[in-house]
């Protein structure tokens, strides 16, 4: 599903179908996406919703400049849902909110520079919609993502939900373990040291198994 989303995002940004096709083909052939999808890591869900949120935000920005905030409520709402699902998939989705916020407020400034009448009303609508769709809705989606816990254990409540959040934060903020194939972040664009996820052991004679994750520097 990342492929059509990337196609749509590139087409909205460039207005050129052939370039969007090339972009979609590049992500379709990206080994990192393929490997993580095949082994069902949770990262692929977060990445998908981050890309979907970016697509909706670009759609929102373009619509605001053409029709005003009142004509951009649909992409605003869909973008908020995508952002919430991304956060519910993995906390890395929260970081995408910074980029979305820059675009969200940046297009308001661009709209103001157009000097269209009724901007004050648009600004109020943008503020109300931003709080509703990018704060309230994502928070509700995140909390509801724990509903299976409630189904499994009816005694599960908000206190237990909060304990889950603090446990995850402590775990990731205090984690000291290392990985034999870890690499410095600045080497990632060129994939100088791809991560080796798995090497098969205790297999029958003559059998080998290996899973590695490395992306395309072009992407």
What residues fall within each predicted segment?
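Transmembrane-helix motifs of polytopic, lipid-linked glycan transferases
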Residues: 1-14, 52-56
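Transmembrane-helix signature of polytopic, membrane-embedded enzymes
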Residues: 6-29, 64-74
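Short helix- or helix-capping micro-motifs
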Residues: 20-28, 35, 55, 83, ...
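Membrane-interface alpha helices of multi-pass inner-membrane proteins
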Residues: 24, 72-91
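Short acidic/glycine- and proline-prone juxtamembrane loop motifs at membrane-interface regions
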Residues: 32-45, 92
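Perimembrane helix-loop-helix junctions
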Residues: 56, 61-65, 72, 83, ...
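Aromatic-rich transmembrane-lumenal/periplasmic boundary elements in polytopic membrane proteins
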Residues: 119, 123-130, 138-191
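Membrane-interface anchor segments at the N-terminal boundary of transmembrane helices
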Residues: 192-219
